[in-house]
Design a protein with these regions (language model features):
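Thiol-based oxidoreductase modules, predominantly thioredoxin-like and allied folds used
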Residues: 101-114, 131-141
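A short beta-strand-turn-helix
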Residues: 49-68, 93
């Protein structure tokens, strides 16, 4: 009987040691890889769209594929939250400038004023690299629909009046992966904790293969 107890203890110790070794093996195998990290959740999908960029060139949902994009909505004459939002966006752009497949896609929420020419002037004044920080204009209803139903940056319930009477003003950013999936969460472009979280999620999505 005493011998059985000793054997059971040895067996238990062997099992514990084996379990620890297996856990350790997989930790070192996947440590630092995308498999070990938690992935930002899929919360929506980019829908088909067709807008014009600051150079008058067509930009569609296909231009999002193969890129990791941060999306925002702003307008060039904004004196309130937009300057701070775009200042924070500039910081994000600088941090990921070395990633060739990273881009910022900024839509106007005031297309009646923000023509292609005005977006170009704004880009020049901000010294934006428009190869990877794209400014878009288009039909107001299409822009607002993308913000609300694809990127989740504004409440669809706000779509209650005629489009001419609506004016969307949102401080939130969205993260889109290479396959057109909206990832992570809706990030507040004015709050540092959200910006820090966004930067971490950008890196996680960039690391995905």
């Amino acid at each position: 009987l005493q011998g059985n107890k000793i054997m059971n203890k040895k067996t238990l110790l062997y099992l514990i040691s084996f379990t620890v070794l297996v856990i350790g093996f997989y930790y070192f195998l996947f440590r630092g890889t995308d498999n070990w990290k938690s992935k930002p959740a899929i919360i929506s999908y980019v829908k088909p769209f067709r807008f014009l960029n600051q150079d008058g060139q067509v930009f569609t949902d296909s231009n999002m594929l193969g890129k990791v994009s941060v999306v925002e909505f702003f307008f060039t004459t904004c004196k309130g939250i937009c300057p701070k939002m775009n200042g924070n966006m500039a910081s994000i752009f600088k941090e990921f400038a070395a990633a060739p497949d990273f881009q910022i896609v900024a839509h106007t929420c005031d297309p009646d004023r923000d023509s292609v020419a005005r977006l170009k002037v704004y880009a020049d004044s901000m010294k934006i690299d428009t190869r990877r920080w794209i400014l878009l204009t288009g039909r107001k209803d299409s822009l607002y629909q993308m913000a609300r139903t694809a990127y989740l940056l504004d409440d669809p319930k706000n779509n209650v009046a005629s489009i001419e009477d609506q004016f969307m003003h949102t401080q939130f950013f969205a993260l889109v992966d290479r396959k057109g999936k909206v990832r992570g969460q809706v990030y507040d472009g004015l709050k540092q904790p959200d910006l820090d979280r966004l930067k971490k999620d950008i890196q996680r999505v960039l690391d995905e293969k």
